[in-house]
């Protein structure tokens, strides 16, 4: 067969380079990966014979279209236009304003339709020459003034008539009465007595404030007028008193809030200059027999999102909507998850831009540049060795085309990232250069999920993912009588029941579900089941997975208590930091100490290990290796409720063979452990979340599959066990979550030994001794600063700091037991509040910052505390403005309208729960209303008085909608 000429190879090479221009492939430069893409994706598109990869690479090199440096290939740079599609942003029309991007909330006032925003502007506007003025006037109709605690503050608001005709001032009244604010005048206007205001005249109205609480006290005040022959009109002002401690003032906004106005909708032309990737010391002997595709999204999908809904039945939006709204079933499994994952990726492209940096310097360190990235230590953004970002010169921001320098991550230390850029940039680098930086995200999790969704039905998993019955076949001929590894499991009826059903395999081919509410020993039960399978079936091969490294490490640690390390192999991802691997896990993980790198042994070398432990995404490596059918007899997934369904399926499709009485009688057991009432996966795409990606496999089965439905007699123990004994929380802390989420079935375990859960029942700070709960009411202000869209509330931080001081300074006295900072956790749903609380504790407050080990006190979001517990939990809810509640619901923020987040937050505490928040705002949510009523009934409420607002006073927006503003 004749060989291809260089010209012919060049032609195919050009086609391959064009093929790589797809957004999901264009950043790839590793020679080995490019070879795989060429062989497995490009060449297989048609049956036409094509040159080898080495031939086209040679042709591109000699024609100066590519450069090869070792294992890295750099193709000639091409111009491209960058467009992103935000699914939170609707296309503009003449009558509506686009919804903000996630985290990109409006700059002032609550989110509202344009008509309502215009109404507020009209409400505060002077009319007919009448103006409202005071010494504390601020923009947008705001009057803000400082007050000191327990001292009356008085100032004057002047109603001035600058017009040519008299007007009548009928009344001055707040739309909602506030006990701190009162309004007085000589002629009784504040009591409804009319007053004629002649041209050039002014009338003073006194505003008085007296408060014994720090906070933010705001009333919207309406001045009602009439003028003949024009009729009545109104002018409004927002009058707010602010009582602050020095700490609160210090923690206030560092700069006025100015929302980040990203030019995301403006297509730009860029040229990419490739960088220098780190040298890979990875030893990968694990086979790659099943290819991993790139799974790019179609460009037309992005266009569909940008165009938005269309009324035409044959529009691309309607076609997409039809698939999204179709019930998930085996016939559309691949197509639906393919679409959901594409939508997720398109939104990820938008969201990663929140971390863009502008006008930032870098420092040269030999051949690398060092960049400070705030938040990288918390994976905000996530930056790992081998990832890449893009940097461009700030001075060339308006140039077209714009040169983007691709920088590969060589290492991450705290908040400093080491980057390898092209020699071209390094030659022009000087210390005073400023850069604009754009981050990227790792597509590997998306790729393995795409493959899993595609393989699921190919591998016959419909009876696993859509189970309808059991084969009624036990793995035991007689009665299973276990020798328990953990005696506490033996004493717990539900845990014992779950283990027995898992080991006998009576649910197969249907998965077995462990429904584990907070503190009920879900992971303990799962680990005992794994140990029993390992002990009872000498030919069993077990894959144990979890969504995160920390959860997978915990499985490994607990298994090692009874199983020798020679049977267990913990496979870490290549990006995992070895310093973070627990010491007792290191001897059985895939780190090669002599080579100082992770290794991935061949299937042959993995065979002696009967238990493999990985994260769900890393299980994709095992799928690529193509183990023989039936190799893994059991797959266990802990914390399954945290993962999107395709992520869980990564550990199933291609690894677990469906149980079959004839061909696979002893295998096919899938066990899922989790709690559908706690936080599930958090997709970035609102479309994907709404249509199934926000529901875990565990939750879908429990919600929509008859085998896992709860009857009057409870759950069918052949398929699911709900654990009932709570070992974590004091019964008072458990009561409300138990009622709201668990049908009041949970029982607080009471052992004979001294119980840590009772340690704070006699603490002097408790409003009611014996009830270790405090709800401290605060009337604060939702604030933002600079370009951060996240909210904070300094009034709540003050209270949190005061309680911390009492807990950590009164140890062993006044009923307060000895406690270390690491036994205390502080939860807040907003990133900026978390940052401000940390700043107060470690830097601003002189008492707390001087305490030893104060850095071990964890402050974080609800998501960061899921699966964890602390002796004491403090919660700062932040929200004090009911007008933002719809925003929280839209963007899945905060506690309100998010019962799962509330459930997780309340159930982290063992012995003491302190909640700080605005009761009037929180009570608008039915779940919070129940908790507040419980605190008040039990005498556990203190702080700012809590009075439920009447429905008619629920919203400023409602008032604006009903007002007659006049002209």
Curated annotation (Swiss-Prot):
The source's superkingdom equals Eukaryota
Q: Where are the residues of the annotated region Disordered?
A: 85-117
Q: Where is this motif: DEAG box?
A: 638-641
Molecular functions per Gene Ontology: 5'-3' RNA helicase activity; ATP binding; ATP hydrolysis activity; RNA binding
Which keywords label this protein? ATP-binding, Cytoplasm, Helicase, Hydrolase, Nucleotide-binding, Nucleus, RNA-binding, RNA-mediated gene silencing
Q: Hey, what's the signal peptide range on this chain?
A: none
Q: According to its UniProt record, where is this protein located?
A: Cytoplasm, P-body; Cytoplasm, Cytoplasmic ribonucleoprotein granule; Cytoplasm, Stress granule; Nucleus
Among InterPro entries, the record links this protein to: DNA2/NAM7-like_C (IPR041679), DNA2/NAM7_AAA_11 (IPR041677), MOV-10-like_beta-barrel (IPR049080), MOV-10/SDE3_DEXXQ/H-box (IPR026122), Mov-10_helical (IPR049079), MOV-10_Ig-like (IPR049077), MOV-10_N (IPR049075), P-loop_NTPase (IPR027417)
Q: Which Pfam families match?
A: AAA_11 (PF13086), AAA_12 (PF13087), MOV-10_beta-barrel (PF21634), Mov-10_helical (PF21635), MOV-10_Ig-like (PF21633), MOV-10_N (PF21632)
Tell me which EC number(s) this protein carries: 3.6.4.13
| Family named by the database record | Belongs to the DNA2/NAM7 helicase family. SDE3 subfamily.
Described purpose of this protein according to its UniProt entry:
5' to 3' RNA helicase that is involved in a number of cellular roles ranging from mRNA metabolism and translation, modulation of viral infectivity, inhibition of retrotransposition, or regulation of synaptic transmission. Plays an important role in innate antiviral immunity by promoting type I interferon production. Required for microRNA (miRNA)-mediated gene silencing by the RNA-induced silencing complex (RISC). Required for both miRNA-mediated translational repression and miRNA-mediated cleavage of complementary mRNAs by RISC.
Q: What is this protein called?
A: Putative helicase MOV-10
């Amino acid at each position: 067969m004749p060989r291809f000429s260089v010209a012919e190879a060049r032609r195919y090479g050009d086609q391959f380079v064009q093929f790589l221009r797809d957004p999901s492939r264009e950043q790839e430069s590793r020679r080995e990966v490019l070879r795989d893409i060429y062989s497995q994706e490009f060449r297989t598109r048609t049956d036409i014979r094509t040159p080898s990869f080495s031939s086209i690479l040679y042709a591109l090199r000699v024609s100066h279209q590519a450069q090869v440096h070792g294992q890295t290939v750099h193709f000639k740079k091409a111009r491209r236009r960058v467009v992103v599609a935000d699914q939170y942003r609707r296309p503009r029309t003449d009558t509506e304003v686009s919804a903000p991007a996630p985290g990109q909330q409006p700059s002032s006032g609550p989110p509202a339709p344009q008509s309502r925003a215009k109404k507020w502007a009209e409400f505060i506007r002077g009319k007919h020459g009448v103006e409202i003025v005071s010494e504390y006037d601020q923009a947008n109709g705001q009057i803000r003034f400082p007050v000191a605690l327990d001292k009356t503050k008085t100032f004057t608001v002047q109603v001035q008539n600058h017009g040519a005709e008299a007007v009548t001032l009928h009344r001055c009244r707040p739309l909602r009465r506030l006990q701190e604010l009162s309004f007085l005048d000589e002629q009784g206007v504040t009591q409804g007595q009319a007053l004629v205001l002649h041209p050039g005249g002014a009338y003073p109205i006194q505003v008085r404030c007296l408060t014994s609480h720090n906070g933010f006290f705001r009333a919207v005040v309406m001045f009602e007028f009439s003028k003949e022959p024009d009729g009545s009109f109104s002018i409004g002002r927002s009058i707010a008193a602010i009582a602050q401690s020095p700490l609160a003032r210090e923690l206030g906004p560092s700069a006025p809030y100015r929302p980040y106005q990203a030019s995301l909708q403006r297509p730009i032309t860029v040229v990419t200059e490739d960088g220098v990737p780190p040298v890979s010391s990875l030893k990968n002997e694990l086979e790659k027999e099943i290819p991993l595709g790139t799974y790019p999204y179609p460009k037309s999908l992005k266009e569909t999102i940008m165009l938005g809904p269309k009324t035409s039945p044959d529009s691309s939006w309607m076609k997409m909507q039809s698939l999204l709204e179709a019930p998930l079933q085996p016939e559309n499994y691949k197509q639906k998850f393919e679409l959901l994952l594409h939508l997720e990726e398109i939104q990820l492209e938008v969201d990663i831009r929140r971390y863009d940096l502008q006008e930032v310097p870098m420092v040269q360190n030999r051949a690398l540049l060092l960049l400070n990235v705030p938040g990288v230590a918390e994976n905000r953004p996530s930056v790992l060795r081998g990832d890449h970002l893009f940097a461009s010169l700030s001075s060339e921001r308006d140039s077209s085309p714009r040169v983007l320098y691709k920088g590969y991550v060589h290492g991450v230390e705290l908040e400093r990232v080491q980057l390898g850029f092209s020699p071209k940039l390094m030659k022009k680098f000087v210390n005073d250069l400023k850069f604009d930086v754009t981050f990227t995200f790792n597509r590997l999790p998306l790729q393995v999920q795409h493959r899993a969704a595609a393989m699921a039905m190919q591998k016959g998993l419909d009876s696993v993912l859509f189970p309808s019955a059991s084969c009624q076949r036990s793995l035991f001929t007689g009665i299973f009588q276990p020798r328990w590894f953990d005696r506490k499991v033996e004493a717990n009826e539900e845990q014992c029941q779950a283990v027995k059903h898992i080991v006998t395999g009576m649910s197969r081919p249907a998965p077995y579900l462990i429904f584990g509410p907070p503190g009920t020993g879900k992971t303990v039960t799962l680990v005992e089941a794994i140990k029993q399978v390992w002990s009872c079936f000498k030919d069993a091969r077990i894959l144990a997975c979890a969504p995160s490294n920390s959860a997978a490490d915990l499985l490994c640690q607990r298994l090692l208590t009874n199983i020798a390390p020679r049977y267990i192999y913990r496979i870490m991802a290549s990006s995992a930091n070895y310093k973070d691997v627990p010491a007792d896990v290191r001897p059985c993980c895939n780190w090669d100490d002599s080579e100082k790198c992770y290794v991935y042994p061949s299937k042959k070398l993995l065979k002696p290990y009967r238990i493999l432990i990985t994260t769900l995404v890393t299980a994709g490596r095992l799928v690529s290796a193509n183990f023989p059918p039936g190799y893994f007899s059991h797959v266990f997934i802990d914390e399954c409720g945290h993962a999107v369904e395709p992520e869980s399926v990564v550990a199933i499709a291609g690894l677990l063979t469906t149980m079959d009485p004839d061909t696979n009688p002893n295998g096919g057991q899938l066990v899922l452990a989790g709690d559908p009432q706690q936080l599930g996966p958090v997709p970035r795409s609102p479309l994907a979340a709404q249509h199934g990606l926000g529901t875990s496999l565990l939750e879908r089965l429990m919600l929509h599959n008859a085998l896992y439905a709860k009857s009057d007699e409870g759950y069918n123990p052949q398929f699911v066990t709900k654990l009932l004994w709570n070992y974590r929380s004091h019964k008072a802390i458990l009561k409300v979550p138990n009622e709201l989420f668990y049908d009041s079935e949970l029982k607080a375990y009471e052992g004979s030994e001294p119980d840590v859960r009772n340690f704070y029942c006699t603490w002097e700070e408790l409003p009611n001794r014996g009830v270790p709960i405090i709800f401290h009411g605060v009337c604060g202000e939702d604030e933002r600063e600079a370009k951060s869209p996240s909210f904070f509330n300094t009034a709540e931080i003050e209270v949190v700091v005061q309680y911390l001081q009492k807990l950590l300074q009164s140890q062993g006295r006044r009923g307060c037991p000895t406690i270390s900072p690491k036994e205390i956790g502080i939860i807040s749903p907003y990133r900026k509040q978390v940052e401000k609380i940390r700043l107060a504790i470690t830097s601003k407050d002189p008492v707390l910052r001087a305490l030893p080990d104060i850095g071990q006190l964890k402050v974080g979001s609800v998501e960061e505390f899921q699966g964890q517990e602390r002796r004491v939990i403090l919660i700062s809810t932040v929200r004090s403005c009911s007008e933002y509640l719809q925003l929280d619901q839209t963007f899945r923020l905060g506690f309100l309208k998010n019962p799962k987040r509330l459930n997780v937050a309340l159930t982290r505490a063992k012995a003491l729960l302190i909640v700080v928040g605005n009761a009037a705002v929180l009570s608008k949510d039915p779940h919070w209303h129940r908790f507040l009523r419980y605190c008040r009934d039990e005498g556990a409420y203190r702080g700012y008085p809590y009075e439920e607002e009447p429905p008619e006073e629920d919203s400023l927006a409602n008032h604006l909608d009903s007002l007659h503003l006049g002209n």
